[in-house]
């Protein structure tokens, strides 16, 4: 039976912390530890803690939602969903990979920037991925890029990892360009990041990509990603589309976006 951890959230009304700075307290024999939600290197080292916080307490639904819209989008074509070769960018400890495997996907390649994510996947979900790379996609060597490309992935997924500095824009575009033309691209993003008033580089990049010739959008849906620590719903967009071509650097230059 999975060990239950003693965790405590800040008292309601006392915390005005932004979503990317939210934190909790972990109670243990050595006392109380304050851990930020985005301190994944710490969270992954403690078996079951990630699942208990984000799925049991905060009711995260994103892996199932994103997998669902990917599957429904692919079914609009004559492609067999189970034959997709999927690159899971920001794979973490394998929650999204596990959801895809449940739906019959046979080929999964994981990527994350922190070794703790890989270690947690091997510990908790051994054998889930055909390969798992600990790599920074903003600094990917030609040799490593060729190795990852050799898997001939025709789909990229990324869940709950965009827009808060977890996966930089350049890394997202690098992964987009690695998958094959006519491949599938599925991700989720906080709803406010699609507001036209958000002028941050990441938001502008995603908006420009969605409405560009490089991606055909098949499905976009606003849904409840999870609850905040105050119990309020946090809404995201889930987006699924099909890649038409690699995105060249000059595309972003022409839009005044630095990646």
Q: At which residue positions do the language-model features occur?
A:
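Conserved alpha-helix/loop element of class I SAM-dependent methyltransferases that forms part
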Residues: 60-82
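N-terminal auxiliary segments of SAM/dcSAM-dependent transferases
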Residues: 1-37
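Conserved class I S-adenosyl-L-methionine
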Residues: 81-92
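Class I S-adenosyl-L-methionine
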Residues: 211-259
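Class I SAM-dependent methyltransferase SAM/SAH-binding core
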Residues: 87, 95-144
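Conserved beta-strand signature within the Rossmann-like core of class I S-adenosyl-L-methionine
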Residues: 182-190
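A short glycine-rich, Lys/Arg-flanked "PGG" loop and its adjoining helix->strand segment in the class I
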Residues: 170-181
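A short SAM/SAH-binding and catalytic strip from SAM-dependent methyltransferases
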Residues: 153-168
